[in-house]
Amino acid sequence: MTRALAGVLVAIALLAGCGGNSVTQPAGSTKVTMTEFKFDPSDITVPHGKVVFFLVNSGNTQHDLAIRDSSNNRLSVSELVSSGDSVVFTVDKIDAGTYTIYCTQQGHEASGMKGKLTVT
């Protein structure tokens, strides 16, 4: 009986280690849900300065969030977020203006995975 209990405990420990990279949403962050092939919300307004995004991948493939200015320069990009995972993406300083957000994965932006970031 002890041996069976030990086996069950080992199995539980192994399954617990299989969890995703999900984290809790920080206070004051902007939640963005990513799916194929869109951001929700796709039109985001935040104050200038430090901006914290809470990215949740509800899709079936990896996604990220990149920020591009009006001159087509990439300002920042999050890490890749696996399906079912969430991450905190911090941009230390962003000036007031209008930016494009998009997914850098091949074909995602062209499929509509983009939006607008307005910084006030």
Where are these regions (language model features)?
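Beta-strand cores of secreted/periplasmic/IMS beta-sandwich domains, seen most often
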Residues: S42-T61, V87-D95, Y99-T100
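Surface-exposed loop/edge segments in extracytoplasmic proteins
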Residues: N72-S78
